[in-house]
Amino acid sequence: MTWRDNQSFPQPTLNTTGIPSVPVDLSSFSELLSRQAPELLPVNRVAYGTTPVGPTDAVPHGTTIVALKYPGGVLIAGDRRSTQGNMIAGRDVQKVYITDDYTATGIAGTAAIAVEFARLYAVELEHYEKLEGVPLTFRGKVNRLAIMVRGNLGAALQGFVALPLLVGYDLDDPHPEGAGRIVSFDAAGGWNIEEEGYQSVGSGSIFAKSSMKKLYSQVSDADSALKVAVEALYDAADDDSATGGPDLVRGIYPTAVTIGAEGAEEVPETRIAELAREVIESRSRTDTFGPDARRGIDARGDS
């Protein structure tokens, strides 16, 4: 790393006031920002001093994010709804971001902090590559994001939680077919590389993950992974009011990004819309209410 005093490790030095100071890691944009303009960090947008509380309804929250690995790559997708308490705060929120050529993030939780997390992380990766002349390894990218999440712990204890889901393609993996990576984080900055092949975060994650568990055997390429992701988000929206499903009336659909050996690429909205219509049509043909409910409908003459 590039330290201000050109040493391998930061050593305390005396500043002009005679007080020991620690050199700044210039390759880390977030650390540089914390020294030069700390008020711009997402964590410092929250006023401290209050007692810890649960997740707050005072600001919009975004959910749900899903990710799946497929042979030769990985896919991440997210719904578009944000909620504020029991109200819908937004219907077309962008929750999935490409952060560099081979990584993308989707963040659930407090919307304002989550969006700034994603943007700051993208700048962090670009800043490192410009200063060092080489991109971070995938493990290095994970550690950088973990440090940023850990820095938000104080706000998280006040209810302003923002949890990312990181996906990427590991260029150092000797087996390209299995180079897709999914990494989940907790509020304290702990992280875990998912080995099952799929993961989800957000209020609808339990429903989305259950759906992916049943459908994951159908994943054979990027397109089949996208279909499973749309199915999972549809299932999450069916049971979680904070998750928005495909909105055919307004033309609002989930967003998705695929990452393979060629790099990260946003999935065209037209393809997602096509799959969403297929899922809705398939679900509409299926009797999901049981024979008793069907007999009741027929008796009323509603069929």
Swiss-Prot record:
<comment type="function">
    <text>Component of the proteasome core, a large protease complex with broad specificity involved in protein degradation. The M.smegmatis proteasome is able to cleave oligopeptides after hydrophobic residues, thus displaying chymotrypsin-like activity. In complex with the ATPase Mpa, degrades protein targets conjugated to a prokaryotic ubiquitin-like protein (Pup). Among the identified substrates of the M.smegmatis proteasome are the pupylated SodA and Ino1 proteins.</text>
</comment>
<keyword id="KW-0963">Cytoplasm</keyword>
<dbReference type="GO" id="GO:0019774">
    <property type="term" value="C:proteasome core complex, beta-subunit complex"/>
</dbReference>
<feature type="propeptide" description="Removed in mature form; by autocatalysis">
    <location>
        <begin position="1"/>
        <end position="62"/>
    </location>
</feature>
<dbReference type="GO" id="GO:0010498">
    <property type="term" value="P:proteasomal protein catabolic process"/>
</dbReference>
<keyword id="KW-0378">Hydrolase</keyword>
<dbReference type="InterPro" id="IPR001353">
    <property type="entry name" value="Proteasome_sua/b"/>
</dbReference>
<dbReference type="Pfam" id="PF00227">
    <property type="entry name" value="Proteasome"/>
</dbReference>
<comment type="similarity">
    <text>Belongs to the peptidase T1B family.</text>
</comment>
<comment type="pathway">
    <text>Protein degradation; proteasomal Pup-dependent pathway.</text>
</comment>
<dbReference type="InterPro" id="IPR022483">
    <property type="entry name" value="PSB_actinobac"/>
</dbReference>
<dbReference type="GO" id="GO:0005737">
    <property type="term" value="C:cytoplasm"/>
</dbReference>
<comment type="subunit">
    <text>The 20S proteasome core is composed of 14 alpha and 14 beta subunits that assemble into four stacked heptameric rings, resulting in a barrel-shaped structure. The two inner rings, each composed of seven catalytic beta subunits, are sandwiched by two outer rings, each composed of seven alpha subunits. The catalytic chamber with the active sites is on the inside of the barrel. Has a gated structure, the ends of the cylinder being occluded by the N-termini of the alpha-subunits. Is capped by the proteasome-associated ATPase, ARC.</text>
</comment>
<protein>
    <recommendedName>
        <fullName>Proteasome subunit beta</fullName>
        <ecNumber>3.4.25.1</ecNumber>
    </recommendedName>
</protein>
<dbReference type="InterPro" id="IPR023333">
    <property type="entry name" value="Proteasome_suB-type"/>
</dbReference>
<dbReference type="GO" id="GO:0004298">
    <property type="term" value="F:threonine-type endopeptidase activity"/>
</dbReference>
<keyword id="KW-0888">Threonine protease</keyword>
<keyword id="KW-0865">Zymogen</keyword>
<keyword id="KW-0647">Proteasome</keyword>
<keyword id="KW-0645">Protease</keyword>
<dbReference type="GO" id="GO:0019941">
    <property type="term" value="P:modification-dependent protein catabolic process"/>
</dbReference>
<keyword id="KW-0068">Autocatalytic cleavage</keyword>
<feature type="region of interest" description="Disordered">
    <location>
        <begin position="282"/>
        <end position="303"/>
    </location>
</feature>
<dbReference type="InterPro" id="IPR029055">
    <property type="entry name" value="Ntn_hydrolases_N"/>
</dbReference>
<feature type="active site" description="Nucleophile">
    <location>
        <position position="63"/>
    </location>
</feature>
